[in-house]
Amino acid sequence: MAKFTLSNLTPDLYQQAHSQDMTLSMLLESLDPATEGSGLDAFERLMKEAGILTKTVRDKNIFSSKVDAFYRTNENKILFPEYVARTLVQAMTEFPIFNYLVATRTPIDSNVYKASYLDWDDTDNKKAVEMRRVTEAADLPIARIKLGDTAITLYKYGRAVEASYEALRRMSLELFERHINRIGTEAANNKVSEILTVIKDGDGNSNAAPKHKAKDLDSSFSAALTKTAWIKFLLKFYPYGCDTVVANEDGLLQILEVLYPASTVASKMDELLAKGLNVSTTLPQDLVVNTTLLYNPDIDKIGGKEAIYGLNRSNTIEEIFEVGSTISEADKFIRNQTQILTISENSGFRKIFKDGARILTLE
């Protein structure tokens, strides 16, 4: 039997969640955890109890509820802001390029954030993180993690939708979700532009991405990316690996030319070795691994030369978002029946490790 039902739902739960750096969904789940195999989290169980259907199942002749379902009771009204927030966040985080660039999302209760960094530029600190042998009487070296000098500022991403209360309440939730998804996709696309800027220039804490020129990696480089330059660039990520690459159209085409060269004697030999002779090679260090190639037209040239961004996804970008920033305007809309519904999220981005990303310029 459920521990938490609609009768327990009050507006104060949003403030309670906010004070604990939690979303309402997180708080509800902590109060009433899902049992193994239930398939629904605490918020979804409350939606089910309220009789609010968000999806149409045509083959069973079941249709999604209308937005009006959130107006039926005071408890249903409380569910609406979190429903909008969940739908928006899902659309943003599932946007393909965004999903591959962000390592983690961290909730905070403010619109500014001071991140912690392991200072690799400090020689003593860099030596301290090396797990080298020490004598029995010697102290272990201390690696220091410190707060960044510059705070990360959060910005609002989203849209304000002008629509009458009457028009929206009669819209099916399935169609309403499509509108929110469109807004979420556009917001995620705007976030990607900011992420790429943080990768390239840093977040204000002296952590711009190291840059490498193709000609310094391969003396035979002239204009087009070479296999030697590409592999040497990937090896710069040692001891980790470059698992994600972002480039514009020209950069992406040059990478594909290296990965899938035109039919030549060399490529035929590669094919024979791989198939005819049944010989394979492994690189267990994951330095040259399966790489996700991402296209983005916002990758600008650097010094007039094409730039290719490489990163280890787990070590590069953290998104910080303000808990409750998606909530207040949706709450005003349904309570006051206003004509402007603001669907947005306050968030910012910071660099986890300076060398988590590197840039290759084709020069």
Question: Where do the PLM segments sit?
Answer:
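Assembly/oligomerization interface modules of large self-assembling protein complexes
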Residues: 68-157
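Short helix/loop capping segments that flank catalytic or ligand/cofactor-binding pockets
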Residues: 129-130, 171, 254-256
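Sequence/fold signature of self-assembling virion shell proteins
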Residues: 2, 259-363
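Extended, solvent-exposed, turn-rich assembly/linker loops in the middle of proteins
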Residues: 204-277
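Intrinsically disordered, low-complexity terminal tails
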Residues: 1-77
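Short, aliphatic-rich beta-strand segments
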Residues: 159-163, 246-248, 339-342
